[in-house]
Amino acid sequence: MKDKQFAIPKATAKRLSLYYRIFKRFHAEKIERANSKQIAEAIGIDSATVRRDFSYFGELGRRGFGYDVKKLMTFFADLLNDNSITNVMLVGIGNMGHALLHYRFHERNKMKIIMAFDLDDHPEVGTQTPDGIPIYGISQIKDKIKDADVKTAILTVPSVKSQEVANLLVDAGVKGILSFSPVHLHLPKDVVVQYVDLTSELQTLLYFMRKED
């Protein structure tokens, strides 16, 4: 399954982990079958969106029969490569970086931060987190990435440094970056970037709250 490639819209791709989480929850609750309405209500979208999303993957269920929970849980696990551990690195150990270092990704999904980086003169460089994650100076980044064969990075550096550090990551062989900076990164087309802009998300939330008043 994991070798098969599906051409799907970006909006659908962003919901894949939600579907996987819901089917894992249904499975834990001993639910064997679920229809599109149940799935939609659990996620907070409409059932037509669920059916449209699933249509990109061929025949996942049958009308009037619903979806086999265990089968779909396995399907999305394969699709998201959640059957094996993905090692991740983190760059920038400020407040956000520290919070992410203490978040136990591997207990919830098959992702694990195995090392972190900051400026060479940062006081925590050369130490480890309570969970044993080593913290290195940025000058070591190329050698450490090569040794660990890490292709995915979380970027939590100040906006003014994000492009510079992203360039370092790409030069070292990183192919995927989750950036917490609002600055758009200009990188090669074969590097995948996802942005998490907490300020923008909060402003959007406040906008919809005002609309409800």
UniProtKB/Swiss-Prot annotation:
SUPFAM superfamilies: NAD(P)-binding Rossmann-fold domains (SSF51735), Winged helix' DNA-binding domain (SSF46785). Residues 18-57 bind DNA. GO terms for cellular component: cytoplasm. The keyword Acyltransferase does not apply. It comes from the Bacteria. Homodimer. Belongs to the transcriptional regulatory Rex family. Modulates transcription in response to changes in cellular NADH/NAD(+) redox state. Binds to the promoter of the aldehyde-alcohol dehydrogenase adhE gene. Functions as a redox-dependent repressor of adhE expression. This is Redox-sensing transcriptional repressor Rex. It comes from Streptococcus pneumoniae serotype 4 (strain ATCC BAA-334 / TIGR4). The lineage of its organism: Bacteria, Bacillati, Bacillota, Bacilli, Lactobacillales. The gene is rex.
